[in-house]
Amino acid sequence: MTRNNFSGAAAHSARSIWRNGRLATLREDLQGLGIVENGAVVCEGGRILFAGPEGELPAELIENTEITDLEGRWVTPGLVDCHTHIVYGGNRAREFEMRLQGATYEEIARAGGGIVSSVKATNALSVEGLVEAALPRLDTLISEGVTTVEIKSGYGLNIEAELKMLCAARALEQIRPVRVVTSYLGAHATPVEYKGRNGDYISEVVLPGLERAHAEGLVDAVDGFCEGIAFSVDEIRRVFDKARSLGIPVKLHAEQLSNLGGAKLAASYGALSADHLEYLDEDGARAMAAAGTVAVLLPGAFYAINEKQKPPVEALRQAGVHIAIATDSNPGTSPLTSLLLTMNMSATLFRLTVEECIAGATREGARALGLLAETGTIEAGKSADLAIWNIESPAELVYRIGFNPLHAHIFKGRRID
């Protein structure tokens, strides 16, 4: 995937060495977390030149180099939040109260709440207003070591507003030390004026909006919501056909509230990921594995809507599907801006292992964005995106609740305190 250069905090050009660290590299050619004791990382020009045991550090890399002693701290890849909706206006606190009174997510949506209720507040804001509203959410993610974040549109539901959201996402990348990947989510919900006319909405808004987003360089992937309260398999297929014709990768919200066959549809298009998946079946898992489609699990949404059906984690494991996790940060069903808490939720609610949680928030998150060649592991040739932690073992990142042990993080070779 082609990425724009980050200009808000340019890559650090000078060579630097981070030594005396305990590296959880997440390299796939190593077992478990890919741990390297007494490790060192050499960065130059925003890239990793060397990552491995300090004793194997080539002498020529040490000359004329800035050296930082990590004092035995743990180092992981920078975290990757691969599914968010952090650009929006307003909030949905009233719906939170409704859920406490017994209303379900589907009942709220059918009554005109849910996604559609965020549209008015979002449409009322300018690009600058959306950036201002999103910054506290993004800053909270960055404060926990996130160096890559995916941001979706989907609260505009008209062409200009969807493009405005994507412009805001691109703007965030220019003013914060983070890599932003954008997803066009025009097929998120049907606006009131198109109620009962999903096909017309796709023809008149979603598809031409996608063409414009692509022409203006605003979209890295195309997403959709395949669900009874949103869009059918056939309707999403129209969107994915357009994405394919434009050469844009796809992903899908699938099997969250029911099984419509969205995961199989996503797999048939070689989707980067299928997300949520509470109602995924074994056939869907096998299709995803065959296509290399990543399962993105979203425990924040599961928790917030008090869902009872859990994603079939064991079926995903048995099929060999890569598993990522993400905050799904959004105003209604996952008002969550902590990837660390997401790790704990993934373990506690979905019974993922510590290794799966950490991999899910680093390597597999990068895989779900088509960025594994760029980030997500600590190895030579990749972007120098690192998180440095004040912990005794990596398990603490998953085990602790309401705890941020980040010492510092590095984005494209530049230290961010």
Swiss-Prot record:
Main location: cytoplasm
Binding site for N-formimidoyl-L-glutamate: 155, 330, 332
Record pathway: Amino-acid degradation; L-histidine degradation into L-glutamate; N-formimidoyl-L-glutamate from L-histidine: step 3/3
The keyword Coiled coil belongs to this UniProt entry's keyword annotation: no
Cofactor note (record): Binds 1 zinc or iron ion per subunit.
Top-level taxon: Bacteria
A single GO cellular-component term on record: cytoplasm
UniProt-listed GO biological process terms: L-histidine catabolic process to glutamate and formamide; L-histidine catabolic process to glutamate and formate
Positions with a binding annotation for 4-imidazolone-5-propanoate: 92, 155, 188, 256, 333
The EC number(s) this enzyme carries: 3.5.2.7
Gene3D superfamilies, per the entry: Metal-dependent hydrolases, Urease, subunit C, domain 1
Cofactors (names): Zn(2+); Fe(3+)
Alphabetical UniProt keywords: Cytoplasm, Histidine metabolism, Hydrolase, Iron, Metal-binding, Zinc
Substrates-to-products reaction catalysed: 4-imidazolone-5-propanoate + H2O = N-formimidoyl-L-glutamate
Family matches, as CDD domains: Imidazolone-5PH (cd01296)
Family matches, as InterPro entries: Amidohydro-rel (IPR006680), HutI (IPR005920), Metal-dep_hydrolase_composite (IPR011059), Metal_Hydrolase (IPR032466)
Listed PANTHER family: IMIDAZOLONEPROPIONASE, IMIDAZOLONEPROPIONASE-RELATED
Positions with a binding annotation for Fe(3+): 83, 85, 253, 328
Organism in which the protein naturally occurs: Chelativorans sp. (strain BNC1)
Protein name: Imidazolonepropionase
GO MF annotation, one: zinc ion binding
Signal sequence annotation: none
Entry's family note: Belongs to the metallo-dependent hydrolases superfamily. HutI family.
Binding site for Zn(2+): 83, 85, 253, 328
Subcellular location: Cytoplasm
Function per UniProt: Catalyzes the hydrolytic cleavage of the carbon-nitrogen bond in imidazolone-5-propanoate to yield N-formimidoyl-L-glutamate. It is the third step in the universal histidine degradation pathway.
NCBIfam families reported in the protein's UniProt record: hutI
